[in-house]
Design a protein with these regions (language model features):
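Membrane-interface segments of envelope glycosyltransferases acting on lipid-linked substrates or membrane lipids
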Residues: 2-5, 14-15, 49, 118-119, ...
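Residue-level detector of anion-binding/catalytic polar loops
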Residues: 45, 77, 126
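Conserved small/polar residues in nucleotide/adenosyl-binding loops
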Residues: 189-191
Length: 191
C-alpha cells in the first residue's frame, strides 16, 4: 500500500508516522511550511500544491482536482491528513473514498471543526482527547477508527491542553495507520 501524507504545519505528525517505520511514498503540502524541511531531511518526495495559486475566490474543487492529479503520479492507495489546513472537495473524496485518514484534537462527535481544543475548554469537560477517523466530504463526520482520552487539568489553557493531545495523537495516529494499512492489504476493509 502506498501512503501519502498531507501536511500544512510543523510536520510533527509526519515525523511520528516516519518514526513508527511506516513507509511514506510522498508528502503533499498546501503552503510553505516547516514540514517541508523535515520531509527533505527524511528524503521523502514532497509536492507543493499552494492554495494561494487558486486566486482570491479560492476554487476548492480545482484545488482538490490538482491534489488528486499530483497524488496519482505516485500511485497512492491511502492518504493520511496530518494537520492539513485546507478542506478538500468532492473530487478528492471520490478518488480516495474510504481511504483518507484524519486526526482531530477532540473525542468526536464532540467538538468537531477547527477549534476542538478551545471548545472542549469552554464547555468545561474533564476529559477530551483525539480521534482518528475516515475523512469524508462532511468535515469530522466520517467513521471513527480510534480514540484516546486526555484529562483536562484545572489550570489548562488551550496551548497546554493541545500539546498533551498532540502528544497522545503522535502515538495513536501511526498505530491506527499501521492497522488500517494491514487490514486493507489483508482485504479486511472493503472499499
Amino acid at each position: 500500500m502506498r501512503l501519502a501524507v498531507l501536511a500544512s504545519g510543523t510536520g510533527s505528525i509526519y515525523k511520528a508516522i516516519i518514526d513508527a517505520n511506516i513507509d511514506v511514498a510522498v508528502v503533499l503540502v498546501d503552503r510553505l511550511c516547516a514540514a517541508i524541511d523535515l520531509v527533505n531531511t527524511n528524503q521523502t518526495p514532497c509536492i507543493t500544491v499552494e492554495r494561494t495559486q487558486f486566486g482570491p475566490e479560492f476554487d476548492r474543487t480545482k484545488f482538490s482536482c490538482d491534489v488528486v492529479a499530483a497524488l496519482t503520479e505516485f500511485n497512492i492507495d491511502v492518504v493520511a491528513m496530518a494537520g492539513f489546513g485546507t478542506v478538500l472537495d468532492a473530487p478528492f473524496f471520490e478518488a480516495y473514498e474510504g481511504r483518507v485518514l484524519n486526526t482531530h484534537p477532540a473525542l468526536l462527535p464532540s467538538f468537531p471543526g477547527w477549534h476542538g481544543v478551545r471548545d472542549a475548554l469552554q464547555h468545561g469537560v474533564k476529559i477530551t482527547g483525539c480521534t482518528v477517523h475516515i475523512a469524508t466530504l462532511d468535515v469530522d463526520e466520517g467513521p471513527i477508527l480510534a480514540q484516546a482520552a486526555v484529562e483536562v487539568f484545572d489550570d489548562d489553557n488551550e496551548a497546554t491542553l493541545h500539546e498533551r493531545i498532540k502528544s497522545t495523537e503522535r502515538d495513536l495516529y501511526p498505530a491506527t495507520i499501521k492497522k488500517f494499512l494491514t487490514d486493507l492489504e489483508l482485504s479486511l476493509i472493503h472499499i
